[in-house]
Amino acid sequence: MTALARRYDTQIHRRVTRTVMVGDVPVGSEHPIVVQSMINEDTLDIEAAVAGIIRLAEAGSEIVRVTTPSMAHAKAMGQIRKELRQRGCSVPLVADVHHNGVKIALEVAQHVDKVRINPGLFIFDKPDPNRQEFSPEEFAAIGQRIRETFEPLVTLLRDQNKALRIGVNHGSLAERMLFTYGDTPEGMVESAMEFVRICHELDFHNILISMKASRAPVMLAAYRLMADTMDKEGFNYPLHLGVTEAGDGDYGRIKSTAGIATLLADGLGDTLRVSLTEAPEKEIPVCYSILQSLGLRKTMVEYVACPSCGRTLFNLEEVLHKVRNATSHLTGLDIAVMGCIVNGPGEMADADYGYVGKTPGVISLYRGRDEIRKVPEAEGVEALIQLIKEDGRWVEPA
């Protein structure tokens, strides 16, 4: 299929990426897009950290990240993993490592399935306020230091068959990248590519890459440029999507969706996290809703409902809530709730079941395009449930 044809195709065509195993969870274009999050408990509080990880796993997080800012935190991950396994929780664990973290990373790699590093902070030198530029020789010398520091971690992860995320943040680019490329997507991409090339030279390919920023336009440009740069250099590593520091509430969700969904629609992205300033488990439904809205994963009922107008023959908002409350535990179904006959049958043609107001006080129930029966409005929701049961597609709520 040509690029132009893909642009107008109703199916999303994912960028082809290699499979990277994070524990027993495969990440890559041949697999469903993976949902993940991060606990906000102190890693040194073993019980609280374990409880937070279990809450996230039960909410649907398929990978869980934990911060490890010190050697003590890194060692605590061993006990956390042990406690989780004793409680029957096998969710893959990721250690988040930042400032000058190679010793921490080498320790924590023994206890987790993946290590995340930040290229801008992996070798952290205090910025020199008097510096005007980096000469090519200075730039290359720091690159050599990075390689010498990074190589032991790459070798360990490769030999233990663990994974690595090269996680660039727009707000923490290294000083030499800022001087050379500016505060730009180009600087973000080169920060990542420096580490990607080292991994490739050391025959380590269990890597994922992220290009996070707090502004969606910057994040979009960085991910697109990263994908193009990898394609040009012959790399096909998976992308981890996210808008960092998105905030909370409706705006935080909208901001994250604007960035993540746009890239997913372009075919970019193999795993995602929605970062909210809220309890981490509240991030998970947003992730699954983004994926479902694009047809990339179906994990809940898809509801089709008109916005209501003067033609509506029943209280659409109230009825939709009743239908949702009765059926939201089901998976894999499309249910349409339409207020009148004008748009009803046409708009819900792709739905498995339809609930349509045709005449006052009467509901028409549909299976696909076929009208099955008419029932009094007061019996509409129960009759819909009965129709689903007749088709063998009903399960009782847990």
Curated annotation (Swiss-Prot):
Pathway membership: Isoprenoid biosynthesis; isopentenyl diphosphate biosynthesis via DXP pathway; isopentenyl diphosphate from 1-deoxy-D-xylulose 5-phosphate: step 5/6
Binding locations of [4Fe-4S] cluster: 306, 309, 340, 347
GO biological process: isopentenyl diphosphate biosynthetic process, methylerythritol 4-phosphate pathway; terpenoid biosynthetic process
Required co-factors: [4Fe-4S] cluster
The UniProt record lists the keyword Iron: yes
Reactions performed catalytically: (2E)-4-hydroxy-3-methylbut-2-enyl diphosphate + 2 oxidized [2Fe-2S]-[ferredoxin] + H2O = 2-C-methyl-D-erythritol 2,4-cyclic diphosphate + 2 reduced [2Fe-2S]-[ferredoxin] + H(+)
Keywords: 4Fe-4S, Iron, Iron-sulfur, Isoprene biosynthesis, Metal-binding, Oxidoreductase
Disulphide bond pairs: none
Co-factor binding comment: Binds 1 [4Fe-4S] cluster.
EC code(s) of this entry: 1.17.7.1
One MF annotation (Gene Ontology) recorded for this entry: 4-hydroxy-3-methylbut-2-en-1-yl diphosphate synthase activity (ferredoxin)
InterPro entries: Dihydropteroate_synth-like_sf (IPR011005), IspG_bac (IPR016425), IspG_bac-typ (IPR004588), NO2/SO3_Rdtase_4Fe4S_sf (IPR045854)
Annotated family: Belongs to the IspG family.
NCBIfam families reported for this sequence: ispG_gcpE (TIGR00612), PRK00366.1 (NF001540)
Job of this protein: Converts 2C-methyl-D-erythritol 2,4-cyclodiphosphate (ME-2,4cPP) into 1-hydroxy-2-methyl-2-(E)-butenyl 4-diphosphate.
Protein name: 4-hydroxy-3-methylbut-2-en-1-yl diphosphate synthase (ferredoxin)
Species this protein is from: Synechococcus sp. (strain CC9605)
Encoding gene per record: ispG
